[in-house]
Amino acid sequence: MTKFCDEFGGEILDGVTSDQILDFLNRITEGTKQQTRHVRYGHLSAFFNFITANIDADFHNPCSTPILRKMFKAKPIPSWEIIEKDVIDEIIFRTDKPRDRLILELMARGGMRIGEVLKLTPADVQDRKLTLKNPKSGKRREHVFIPQKVADRLKAYIRDNNIQPNQRIFPICYETARTMVKKAGEKVGIRLRPHDLRRHAATYASRSGVPIEIVSKVILRHANLSTTQIYLGKVPDTEAMRWIENLYA
């Protein structure tokens, strides 16, 4: 609202037109994601609605036009197909190459992004706790927690390959890793992408009873729960019935 006040502070609000609002919103949201555009529009529209509801019932909200609502509407939430645990397990167990299996496990068991996996060095590994330097969130560092069996395999891989503390554990490019994941999925007849494995880590934890706050803040390391809820996808009827039955059995 500061930018709005700077631009329109000297004007009578009744005189602000929809065209002016459109121009203003386009300028302050240039280069941003659609969700950001929607939020900025929502804040401004709520401000004008407040005036109508509390100050002047005859005031017309300049944001309330079909073209503005269409241009700044929220992006539809994607519906992800959730891959079941037995399928993920089969993919991992059928991957013979130690390097490739570890990459798959770190994503599927630790909820890591492919880019985070490829940046790992031995210096980042403290048994079951992995340190991510300069993560996507913009924080100085974040931490990932992995199962003991995966941690043991990771340490053995580092030792057996004589990887030095500041060398990358997996010195391959993103495209090579993406292709490996795709081929791993093809072995069991599914289309598999790196992020499907991270999404599986969250979904499996959630359906196993892990509190959503832990799924969000620890496994996925999201800033807010709304992003996590997109990851978790839809709960099928059979899953819903199983949980209700267990709850009241």
Model-derived regions, located:
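Catalytic-site neighborhood detector that most strongly recognizes the C-terminal catalytic loop/helix
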Residues: 136, 219-245
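N-terminal core-binding DNA-recognition domain of tyrosine recombinases/integrases
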Residues: 1-77, 161, 187
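Short, basic (Lys/Arg/His-rich) helix/loop patches that form interaction surfaces
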Residues: 163-167, 178-218
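Short, polar N-cap/turn motifs at the start of nucleic acid-interacting alpha helices
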Residues: 125-127, 191, 210-230
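DNA breakage-rejoining catalytic core of tyrosine-based enzymes
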Residues: 72-89, 137-148, 163-168
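Basic, Lys/Arg- and aromatic-enriched nucleic-acid-binding interface segment
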Residues: 85-114
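Conserved tyrosine-mediated DNA breakage-rejoining catalytic core shared by Y-recombinases
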Residues: 110, 115, 119-156
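Major-groove DNA-contacting interfaces characterized by cationic-aromatic clusters
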Residues: 133, 148-180
